[in-house]
């Protein structure tokens, strides 16, 4: 028999230290706060935990009226061989990402101390924890102190399922073939070795990444459930996989997207982008952006620039310095692009270059935008699908390759342009893919139609009145969390 629902609820959220994790956690926290304000029967408090330098980043993403409290756990990056500002994925080169992952395990005891403290303070309140999959030890700590806990994955279920299976089993090491099936996820289809990020491809079970993953992933079984930033109608295969291998509830609650943060970029950039888009015909623009952490080779930049110019399509390109060039301040794009490129596209008004950051949601929601050339990060995919914009995929790292597989092979809203940061890519190949999706080809018409259909599926998932699948998922999670009695 279920216990009576407690009157008060304390929600503790702990994202990993990276903007791609923090921002979805903030978006989920704000959604939960909104739900709890509407449900006045319970007094609810929400806290977010992180390290000292990440607390201001979280605070900057919260509206001033939010009552979400921020809790700082002690952490000194220099104690772990990291730069003094090395508390966030975004501030580190890829070579040091594993060092931050390993260092995060030092937060376990401070987290336990914090949980012990609030359990003494909260009395009869129900305390639940929402943790990050890179902080897999959270589940065990919560089980030991008697607190209900779930993982919130900012990644989709299909992508994370492939990621989990490969790290635990390293199936590509068992075959000389270029393609292989996943041991416990064969329904995902064949994976190609070129669809593995560099750390996976080089893994042998004794390398730093393998050792870390084999410590963290088994800890996922200590959690009482999973929340996924995804939509059941497009990610059922991945959700079913996690239900099968974990035996615990798995809830889709996406898309969990934060409203655009107007403080990130300058007002002049937003106005320039809007004015430029307003001047273009409907469905005529290619938007190119590879996320906040990814850069491409300078040779790739040259080929991409030539392709965008040769395609004769309008485009917005968010330009970052190429791989190997660390430029934290302003940089001159002319040094990395074909001679006269910026002047020609400015004169013709056919292209707009934006440095480092652009108002992505504003661009994707604009009627002039036709297709998104993306690194296939999950947040970018959700933003694109939410606005009915098909994709040109160029996956580069992490689970992005598997996201690309899902979008192209299983959903049909994407065409892969390139694969990885070291691939060979030619101007003509990019041009042909752009035209394939944007012009009146059979493939292009079908992909654009499918993207519009998926937009409607995503919209319905979040509709309150008719109880969309993600609305139901979040309600079921909260209902279970409120009555769950954790067995010690």
Curated annotation (Swiss-Prot):
Keyword field contains Lipid biosynthesis: no
Record carries keyword Oxidoreductase: no
EC number from the UniProt entry: 2.4.1.-
Any Pfam family hit: UDPGT
EC class (word): transferase
Disulfide bonds: none
MF annotations from Gene Ontology: glucosyltransferase activity; UDP-glycosyltransferase activity
Keyword vocabulary terms for this entry: Glycosyltransferase, Transferase
Superkingdom as given in the UniProt entry: Eukaryota
InterPro entries for this protein: UDP_glucos_trans, UDP_glycos_trans_CS
UniProt xrefs under Gene3D superfamilies: Glycogen Phosphorylase B
Family classification: Belongs to the UDP-glycosyltransferase family.
Name of protein: UDP-glycosyltransferase 92A1
UniProt gene name: UGT92A1
């Amino acid at each position: 028999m279920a216990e009576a629902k407690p009157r008060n609820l304390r929600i503790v959220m702990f994202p990993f230290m990276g903007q791609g994790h923090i921002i979805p956690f903030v978006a989920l926290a704000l959604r939960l706060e909104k739900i709890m304000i509407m449900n006045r029967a319970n007094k609810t408090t929400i806290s977010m935990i992180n390290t000292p330098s990440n607390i201001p980043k979280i605070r900057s993403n919260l509206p001033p009226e939010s009552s979400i409290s921020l809790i700082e756990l002690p952490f000194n990056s220099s104690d772990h061989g990291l730069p003094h500002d090395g508390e966030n994925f975004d501030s580190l080169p890829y070579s040091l990402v594993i060092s931050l992952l390993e260092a995060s395990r030092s937060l376990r005891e401070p987290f336990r101390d914090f949980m012990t403290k609030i359990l003494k303070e909260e009395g009869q309140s129900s305390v639940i924890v929402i943790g990050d999959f890179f902080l897999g030890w959270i589940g065990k700590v919560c089980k030991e102190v008697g607190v209900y806990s779930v993982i919130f994955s900012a990644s989709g279920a299909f992508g994370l399922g492939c990621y989990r299976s490969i790290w635990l089993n390293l199936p590509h090491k068992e075959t000389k073939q270029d393609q292989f099936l996943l041991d416990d996820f064969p329904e995902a289809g064949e994976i190609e070795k070129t669809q593995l990020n560099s750390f996976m491809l080089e893994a042998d079970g004794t390398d730093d990444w393998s050792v870390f993953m084999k410590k963290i992933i088994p800890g996922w079984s200590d959690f009482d459930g999973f929340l996924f930033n995804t939509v059941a109608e497009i990610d059922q295969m991945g959700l079913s996989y996690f239900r099968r291998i974990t035996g615990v509830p798995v809830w889709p609650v996406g898309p969990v997207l934060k409203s655009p943060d107007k403080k990130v970029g300058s007002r002049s950039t937003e106005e320039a982008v809007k004015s430029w888009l307003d001047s273009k015909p409907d469905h005529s623009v290619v938007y190119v952006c590879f996320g906040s952490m990814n850069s491409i080779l300078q040779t790739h930049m040259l080929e991409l620039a030539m392709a965008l110019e040769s395609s004769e399509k309008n485009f917005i390109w968010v330009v970052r310095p190429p791989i190997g060039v660390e430029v934290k301040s302003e940089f001159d794009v002319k040094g990395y692009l074909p001679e006269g490129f910026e002047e020609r596209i400015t004169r013709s008004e056919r292209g707009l270059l934006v440095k480092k950051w652009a108002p992505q949601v504003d661009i994707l929601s604009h009627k002039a935008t036709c297709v998104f050339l993306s690194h296939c990060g999950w947040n970018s995919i959700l933003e694109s699908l939410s606005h009915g914009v098909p994709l040109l995929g160029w996956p580069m790292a992490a689970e992005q390759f598997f996201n690309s597989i899902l979008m192209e092979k299983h959903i049909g809203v994407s065409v892969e342009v390139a694969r990885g940061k070291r691939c060979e890519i030619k101007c003509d190949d990019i041009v042909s893919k752009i035209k394939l999706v944007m012009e009146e080809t059979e493939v292009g018409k079908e992909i654009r139609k499918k993207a519009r259909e998926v937009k409607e599926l995503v919209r319905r998932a979040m509709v309150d009145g008719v109880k969309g699948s993600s609305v139901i998922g979040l309600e079921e999670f909260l209902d279970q969390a409120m009555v769950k009695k954790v067995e010690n």
